[in-house]
């Protein structure tokens, strides 16, 4: 997911390098908070939201998932990385399984997202996406990550 967004900003980093720099894969993949730290080290401005004070370790703004936050970033041309509950999005997987996707647009009450799993672009009803975010937000170090080139 981060690799997709870095590529959007013309920054190429291999999947292997990202995994190595964030300390390897955890039991359930990567933590959004670790991706945020890595993006900061690359010189990006980072917006990171969490709904779990303990897991975020003080590295994210604590707030509940909501549609206006996502739309604000999209309006400014920034892709939005989100951690969602897998079974809500895809109607499959374990009830406690999370997945990270990249939201790239919004049209006709649907969000458009890129799925790092298969690289395909997909659409999802906005209410379903917010439900998937809310159901995963308490189990995630962070549920939303936006990076922006630091222009000085």
Predicted feature locations:
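Cysteine-nucleophile protease catalytic domains, especially the papain-like/related folds used
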Residues: 1-68, 76, 143, 147-151
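Structural motif
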Residues: 81-83
């Amino acid at each position: 997911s981060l690799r997709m967004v870095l590529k959007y900003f013309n920054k190429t980093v291999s999947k292997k390098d990202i995994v190595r720099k964030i300390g390897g894969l955890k039991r359930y993949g990567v933590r959004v908070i670790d991706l945020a730290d890595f993006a900061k080290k690359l010189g990006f401005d980072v917006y990171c939201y969490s709904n779990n004070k303990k897991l975020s370790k003080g590295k994210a703004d604590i707030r509940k998932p909501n549609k206006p936050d996502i739309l604000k970033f999209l309006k400014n041309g920034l892709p939005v990385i989100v951690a969602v509950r897998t079974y809500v999005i895809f109607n499959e997987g374990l009830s406690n399984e999370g997945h990270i996707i990249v939201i790239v647009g919004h049209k006709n009450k649907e969000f458009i997202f890129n799925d790092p799993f298969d690289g395909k672009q997909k659409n999802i009803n906005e209410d379903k996406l917010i439900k998937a975010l809310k159901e995963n937000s308490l189990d995630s170090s962070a549920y939303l990550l936006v990076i922006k080139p630091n222009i000085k």
